[in-house]
Amino acid sequence: MAVYIAREATKLWRKVCAEIAVELQLLFEKWRLLLAGLVFQYIHGLAARGVHYLHRPGPLLQDLGFMALPELGQDKGYVSESVFTFIFISFLLWSFHPFIYHSKRFYTVLLWRRVLAFLVASQFLRIITFYSTQLPGPNYHCREGSKMATLPPPHNVLEVLLINFPRGVLFGCGDLIFSSHMIFTLVFVRTYHKYGSKRLIKILAWLMAIIQSLLIIASRKHYSVDVVVAWYTVNLVVFFIDNKLPEMPDRTNGSSLLPVTAKDKDGRTKEELHKLEKDCKMKEEFHKLLNGNTVDSTDRRQRVQMNGKHGEDINHTLSDATPNGT
């Protein structure tokens, strides 16, 4: 038993090392895009922190979701956060499963490049919307009478840049339209729906996205419009960007080979074009042979001249032979 475990552990370690080597090569090629996506996460947090200084508490707006869903209460606000944390960690672990399991449908680096592209585009639109109009926050710490509803002017730039993480992120106000939690949730769910392999998990993922939407409204963390706008905005963003980005190579066969680089692809394309031109020429000649049009006008003139010369040679030979015959 111990020998079997040791042998399997060795195989697993070799597999992990091989996958790390492959992913590191991809990381060296794509690190700029990944770094830009991570930096924008900080910019998004900084923008949310900045709008908190502009937030002014007021009476809650009339909301259909608030009327339809019972209020969970301040002491149960952790429920929606727990669901979101579960979705986030589950997706994070799944995105690294090619390092361990045989079934590999994607490269982790390329997957996260797409995910960050979806997140950045959605968050950029979100920043524009919540700076365009500041609504009175429905969350408990954003209501009238709360000390955290409005932030005092910052004493220095460093206070703004540090964004009071993580408290400043969890207890922000003013960054409403549209929900950041729903951006992450929908991007993760849509990504798994495309690259995941378990149909049951796909159904459960969409179900959890719906439950997360209802919990956010019931917890009074966002208005219903914030969730509704997130649903169609994020889905449209993912749809358009996904069509613009090059499709990731399929790894269903378990291959650990790197995808073809642009340089290799260009070289291969030139060879394929050269072969294609050759094939086209051969096909044209074949069709000409079938149709009786084997030569062009230049070749025809040359052949006519050759035939004429050949005829003259024959006549000359015959004329020379005639006296000898008589």
Curated annotation (Swiss-Prot):
EC annotation from Swiss-Prot or TrEMBL: 2.7.8.-
Deletion phenotype: Reduced plant stature. Spontaneous HR-like cell death (SHL).
Active site: H181, H222, D226
Pfam families: PAP2_C
Membrane topology summary: Multi-pass membrane protein
Taxonomy, superkingdom: Eukaryota
Biased composition (Polar residues): 316-326
Any GO MF annotation of the entry: inositol phosphoceramide synthase activity
Gene Ontology CC annotations of this record: endoplasmic reticulum membrane; Golgi membrane; plasma membrane; trans-Golgi network
Predominant subcellular localization, coarse grouping: Golgi
Protein name: Phosphatidylinositol:ceramide inositolphosphotransferase
Taxonomic classification: Eukaryota, Viridiplantae, Streptophyta, Embryophyta, Tracheophyta
Gene (UniProt): ERH1
